[in-house]
């Protein structure tokens, strides 16, 4: 797996990587159930005994990339839970901040106890880059109200917000399967089709989301100016 950030689970590495083996229909089911518990249980069904992690230039905010942070290293381990606990520490999270890591430990998939970590370095060690503690993903998440959203839909929304629209938004944007059959003010994706202002698509692209939100803001400004 690539060591990288994730817009919903904060990190994705050894444990969540196994979700890629599932068919798309089952992936959507994971989101409907809430990602963390199914990911933890997946670790019981798919055993990993050697994990080689690509930490060359992953994006530490979003799983789809776009903002690579160059580390130029690989690391390997035998315990997927311990690997993910280490990744949490590297990205300034505690294992408790990523619920599926602790859940997997409680299920017996592995250990999240970093005191059990034994690191052996191979090859020359270059200048170590310090991973920033505060990253934009947290601020952008505050603008979104998500319930059982799929990673693709959520992942496209975050870059759209990043394009300068965030300060102009007054309402939270609703997204996710949990809004099916419900009403509201502002939503993106087909699951929010009952909302007063909605962008359909499963998922709509980041360009479509950007144009939709830009138009939404422009319409609101015009309405306010006419009052």
Language-model regions: role of each:
Residues 1-227:
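Extended, low-polarity segments enriched in aliphatic/aromatic residues
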